[in-house]
């Protein structure tokens, strides 16, 4: 059986935590920022975890 390959797009966007959960950056932080408040932009800087429903599918993209 051939080796499983890591999905490179997912690998660049996600990191595995020590407990095996997936960490991701928040969306809406790239452009059109003038109409967003400073508080909103500050909160968008924080990272968050991938939801449990999505994590199962995404884990298949990152086998290693």
UniProtKB/Swiss-Prot annotation:
Protein known as: Large ribosomal subunit protein bL35
InterPro entries in the cross-refs: Ribosomal_bL35, Ribosomal_bL35-like, Ribosomal_bL35_sf
Keyword hit for Ribosomal protein: yes
Entries under Gene3D superfamilies matching the protein: 4.10.410.60
GO terms classed as biological process: translation
Gene Ontology CC: cytosolic large ribosomal subunit
Record keywords, A-Z: Ribonucleoprotein, Ribosomal protein
Protein family per UniProt: Belongs to the bacterial ribosomal protein bL35 family.
GO molecular function annotations of the record: structural constituent of ribosome
Pfam families to which the protein is assigned, alphabetical: Ribosomal_L35p (PF01632)
Region feature (Disordered): 1-25
NCBIfam families on file: rpmI_bact (TIGR00001)
SUPFAM superfamilies, per database record: L35p-like (SSF143034)
Gene designation: rpmI
Superkingdom, taxonomy of origin: Bacteria
Organism lineage: Bacteria, Bacillati, Bacillota, Clostridia, Peptostreptococcales
HAMAP family per UniProt: Ribosomal_bL35
């Amino acid at each position: 059986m051939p080796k499983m390959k890591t999905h490179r797009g997912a690998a660049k966007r996600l990191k595995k935590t020590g407990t095996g959960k997936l960490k991701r950056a928040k969306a809406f932080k790239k452009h059109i920022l003038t109409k967003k408040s400073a508080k909103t932009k500050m909160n968008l800087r924080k990272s968050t975890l991938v939801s449990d429903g999505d994590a199962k599918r995404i884990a298949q993209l990152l086998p290693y």
